[in-house]
UniProtKB/Swiss-Prot annotation:
Species in which this protein is naturally found: Oryza sativa subsp. japonica
A GO MF label: cysteine-type endopeptidase activity
Enzyme Commission numbers on file: 3.4.22.-
Protein known as: Cysteine endopeptidase RepA
SMART domains assigned: Inhibitor_I29 (SM00848), Pept_C1 (SM00645)
Propeptide: 25-141
List of catalytic residues: C167, H303, N324
GO CC entries: extracellular space; lysosome; protein storage vacuole
Length: 378
């Protein structure tokens, strides 16, 4: 169960232009040299990021003890980021982002979470509906050297799940938004909140879920409504059945990408955005700012994201373009480029090739407004 926390020279240039880092707090070694300079750096950070943190055990969120603890955590993280960026040979950088006063454990519990319990092998097997993989016959040698579904208009803006473990809903919705644009020509921003509130048979709202279960729910429910009709609140509430009955976008089902096969994942992403799971609870992922991520991570999958493209840098490093749900002030304006092709038949970096799936939509059919059945809110 995911608790949470995604060529030619011209294509390379376009990818570089789209990879600008989010705004972060710049600092130098001198900012770490004394208590006074560290306090000044911390206040600069606090003036940028107004975020609410869980109180320390037994304390109050704004008392002196908790404030001191937050400062100490910030200092440790700032020093880690500085030392990591000083090391050579890493094609990515870290930054003091909005998570800079959170311990790794707090970050994991709030934005990542319940790890390997979600694996499909523990939830009824693999293969999606019918066990097929429609892109299996595609010739790998004939795939485009780079794909970016953002540039094809099939990706909505970056969203922010907040302190709610609903990454699975954002991953699901990104994939459905993408295939709907490809099949109908319409990019519609869809409702994660409907999934959080209403898809409660197998998924657990802010306490985690699986993208495959969410695809099943959308099909079974007859579609999914829009973000504007059922806005996101970053908390689980009572299902608004009247709003959820507005089936603005439909799918026919879903399929799973063969596990541990980056070649198969590339074939799928060449055709549509794909829901994927990664391990995102390490410090390098927490503070990622820009570049091709090659940082420390394992395969305890704890975060749902969407693979919305792939490419290659000028120096030949292959990468995935991954849409996250932590807001535009994380990573490359909400995205992360993750190293691709780590090894043949591998799990992929951070397990990205282990649990990928995508929605199936055969044509331009969506529910018409005239056919909507509005039910009483319950």
């Amino acid at each position: 169960m995911l608790r949470c926390f995604l060529v030619a020279a011209a294509a390379v240039a376009l990818a570089a232009a789209a990879a600008a880092p989010a705004r972060a707090i710049p600092f130098t070694e001198s900012d770490l040299s004394s208590e006074e300079s560290l306090r000044a750096l911390y206040e600069r950070w606090r003036s940028r990021y107004t975020v609410s943190r869980p109180a320390a055990s037994g304390g109050v969120g704004n008392d002196d003890g908790e404030a001191r603890r937050r400062f100490n955590v910030f200092v440790e993280n700032a020093r880690y980021i500085h030392e990591a960026n000083r090391r050579g040979g890493r094609p990515f950088r870290l930054a003091l982002n909005k998570f800079a006063d959170m311990t790794t454990d707090e970050f994991r519990r709030t934005y990542a979470g319940s790890r390997a319990r979600h694996h499909r092998s523990l939830s009824g097997g693999r293969g999606g509906e019918g066990g097929s993989f429609r892109y299996g016959g595609d010739d790998e040698d004939n795939l485009p050297p780079a794909v970016d579904w953002r540039e094809r208009g099939a990706v909505t803006g970056i969203k922010d799940q907040g302190q709610c473990g609903s990454c699975w809903a954002f991953s699901t919705v990104a994939a459905v938004e993408g295939v709907n644009k490809i099949k109908t020509g319409r990019l519609v921003t869809l409702s994660e909140q409907e999934l959080v509130d209403c898809d409660t048979g197998d998924n657990q709202g802010c306490d985690g879920g699986l993208m495959d279960y969410a695809f099943q729910f959308i099909k079974r429910n007859g579609g999914i409504t829009t973000e504007s009709n059922y806005p996101y609140r970053a908390e689980q509430g009572r299902c608004n059945k009247a709003k959820a009955s507005s089936h603005d976008v439909t799918i026919d089902g879903y399929e799973d990408v063969p596990a541990n096969d980056e070649s198969a994942l590339q074939k799928a992403v060449a055709n549509q955005p794909v829901a994927v799971a990664v391990e995102a609870s390490g410090q390098d992922f927490q503070f990622y700012s820009e570049g091709v991520f090659t940082g420390e991570c394992g395969t305890d999958l704890d975060h749902g994201v969407a693979a919305v493209g792939y490419g290659i840098t000028r120096d030949g490093t292959k990468y995935w373009i991954v849409k996250n749900s932590w807001g535009e002030d994380w990573g490359e304006r909400g995205y992360i480029r993750m190293q691709r092709g780590v090894s043949s038949d591998s799990n992929g970096l951070c397990g990205i090739a282990m649990e990928a799936s995508y929605p199936v939509k055969s044509g331009a059919r969506n529910a018409a407004a005239s056919n909507r059945v509005v039910k009483d809110e319950m």
